[in-house]
Each structure stands twice: as C-alpha cells, then as structure tokens.
C-alpha cells in the first residue's frame, strides 16, 4: 500500500508539473479528482441519530474515538483514519493540507468546514482505511437549515467518493426520517450498488417476535422509500461489548447466531 501511495503522489506531481501546463496552453481543463487516483478505501456511515454509527466505529477501531450517546452528539462530519500518533485537525486545515485529498470540499462553505473534523489514531484496524462518520438524521427534510450548511450536498459529495456506504437503523427507530427519505431518493440515486442497510442493536429486541416486528417495519418503510422492485437485503448486527440481551431467557434471540 505504501508503494501505491508513492505512485499516487508521483502521478499528481507529474500532472502538476507537466500535464497541467499543457492543459493551460491548449485551454483544456481536466483536474485530477479523488476518484481519478484513489487512495485508501473509504467507508461512509449514514443513519438516524442514536443508531449506533459512532459505537460501531469505536468497536471496529478498538478504541473510544467517537463520542456516542442516545441524544445527537455531533452535527458535523468526521474523517477517521490511521496515524502513528493520535492527531486531530479542524476542517479548514483538512481542505488545505497538501497530503490529504479533500481540497474539493472547500466549496461546501465555511459552516461545513467549521464542523468538519479529522482524526488520526494508531489503531491497526484503521490502517489503509478511512471511515467517514456523519451526523444522525432527523425527522425533518430541512435539516440543512438547522445545521447551517447543505447537509444533503455534503452527503452526496462523500457518497460519490466512498467505496462503501453503511446505512444504519435501530429497533427504537426502524422508520425512515424525513432526512433519510430525502437521502435515499435524491442523494444516493445511482449509488445504490455501494449501499448496505444495517439493522443495528438487535440485542435490544427481547423476544424473537420483537425482532420480527422491527425487521418487518423497516422493510415496509424502505419499500416505500427505495424505488426498487424488491426490498434490499437488510443486515443485522450488534456490538457484543454493549449487548443487553440475556441468552438464557425464554424466546430471546440467539445472538450467537448473528455475525458481525
């Protein structure tokens, strides 16, 4: 992977010193984008607030990197990747940093940059991987007005450059919020091949009938939102360290059969 990064930098250097001059001379504009010379794989986390996105990231990294809670804990995007030492940057630094490929995010506005964060952490599971945590979606399609920046446009921009998009739901909120409907029907159009739908926190379902009811509700809501003939596959998961189920209780879900 280090050789790939060096090759990427050489390509960008050649473009800047040679190809860009030719493009300027012949009045031809074709800048390199992140998708032209890809770096480490990117995973975008979307979902309703308190659906377990940040907790899942912490579990994956094996460290408490993101703050998590029942109430919305953040209103901006967070870029999380590997670093030899723990480090954080604000949004303005991220889009102007010469070694980071987020320069094109600068045009999303100062309000977006004020809430954008970059976190590097020495967790081996993050090596050669970038995770993008997003604010929890709310029951209003006009969330951009509440956040102060164009949330939907930011989602689209990150989704286009992401290699995988994980969309989280949980048993407490198996329905689709106003923002979720907007994201599915507008911002993720043409990108559905990247999306995996996750029903998280299934350990909160005390009985198998509770799980069936929750799963069915989510399927029904998604069928009215996603314009496809068949309901997309829904993956179920939970975080073992946070599990609340009691395996010896009658009719409880056999959590040992659920794979993360």
Locations of the language-model features?
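Conserved nucleotide-binding/hydrolysis micro-motifs of P-loop NTPases
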Residues: 85-87, 136-138, 172-174, 201-205, ...
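Conserved active-site aspartate in kinases
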Residues: 133
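Flexible beta-alpha connector loops of hexameric P-loop NTPases
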Residues: 138-147
């Amino acid at each position: 992977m280090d050789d790939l990064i060096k090759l990427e930098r050489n390509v960008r250097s050649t473009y800047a010193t040679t190809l860009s001059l030719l493009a300027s001379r012949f009045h031809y504009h074709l800048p390199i984008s992140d998708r032209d010379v890809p770096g480490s794989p990117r995973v975008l986390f979307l979902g309703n607030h308190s659906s377990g996105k940040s907790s899942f990231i912490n579990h994956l990294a094996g460290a408490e990197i993101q703050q998590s809670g029942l109430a919305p804990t953040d209103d901006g995007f967070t870029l999380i990747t590997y670093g030899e030492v723990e480090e954080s940057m604000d949004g303005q630094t991220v889009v102007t940093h010469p070694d980071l490929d987020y320069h094109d995010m600068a045009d999303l506005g100062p309000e977006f940059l004020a809430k954008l964060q970059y976190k590097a952490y020495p967790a081996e599971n993050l090596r050669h991987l970038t995770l993008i945590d997003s604010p929890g979606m709310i029951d209003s399609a006009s969330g951009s007005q509440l956040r102060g920046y164009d949330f939907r446009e930011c989602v689209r921009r990150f989704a286009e450059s992401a290699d995988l998009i994980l969309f989280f739901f949980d048993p407490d909120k198996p329905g689709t919020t106003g923002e979720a409907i907007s994201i599915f029907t507008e911002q993720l159009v043409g990108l559905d091949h990247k999306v995996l739908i996750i029903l998280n926190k299934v350990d909160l379902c005390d009985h198998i009938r509770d799980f069936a009811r929750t799963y069915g509700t989510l399927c029904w809501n998604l069928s009215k939102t996603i314009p496809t003939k068949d309901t997309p596959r829904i993956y179920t998961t939970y975080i073992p360290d946070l599990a609340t189920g009691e395996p010896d209780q009658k009719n409880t879900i056999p959590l040992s059969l659920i794979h993360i």
